[in-house]
């Protein structure tokens, strides 16, 4: 019985099949390794090895962008090396302004300023004659021979016009002051010629006091009383007017 059962068990056993299928060989990629795994590149500007890969320019694998930590500048493989300053900057350079500010010339030159002012203060009429004859022309409006109107801009012309306007106002003010100082006394009082100035009459007072001192004539003549208590005063003025007519 034992032998029969053992034979039945051995005859029903099936061995496992071993898979002998080999894996296919790996395909070798022809792509270039990533710049991160490449050896460190030298900076084309300073030949420093302290560089690193940043990113791909315009998402193109053929234009990797690197950064140099030594000179702190970027460069792209196959691209032109631009002269970008450290930290970056705008391409528009700040050009210095070529416009020159025109300084307004003084009213009087340095050499003759004190003499001209003394002449204006002490002798206004003489200074007025010199101005009318062109004596102050060199002091009022000195011109710079190096000034070139063709190279000036709108701003310089506007400033020049403002200076010229100020000088004209100063000249008018000085001219009006000279005219007032040179006018005679009779012309200054022209506006008062139509006013009649009555000189004080000394005849009335002298006559009244003479009559009062002698004690007579103060109450002489017709006594006119207008109910205001001024009858004597009216009589005095009446007699004074009669004596003045005589």
UniProtKB/Swiss-Prot annotation:
Record's compositionally biased regions (Polar residues): 1-12, 27-37
Superkingdom assignment: Eukaryota
Gene Ontology CC: nucleus
Signal peptide start-end: none
Keyword check for Transport: no
Protein's name in the database: Dof zinc finger protein DOF4.7
Keywords: DNA-binding, Metal-binding, Nucleus, Transcription, Transcription regulation, Zinc, Zinc-finger
Quaternary context: Interacts with ZFP2.
Role summary: Transcription factor that binds specifically to a 5'-AA[AG]G-3' consensus core sequence. Involved in the negative regulation of floral organ abscission by binding to the typical DOF 5'-AAAG-3' sequences in the promoter of ADPG2/PGAZAT, and by down-regulating its expression. ADPG2/PGAZAT is an abscission-related and cell wall hydrolyzing polygalacturonase. May act through the interaction with ZFP2, an abscission-related transcription factor.
Organism the protein comes from: Arabidopsis thaliana (Mouse-ear cress)
Zinc finger (Dof-type): 41-95
Organ and tissue specificity: Highly expressed at the base of all organs of the flower, especially in the abscission zone (AZ) of petals, stamens and sepals. Expressed at low levels in sepals, filaments, stigmatic papillae, tips of young siliques, and at the base of pedicels and leaf trichomes.
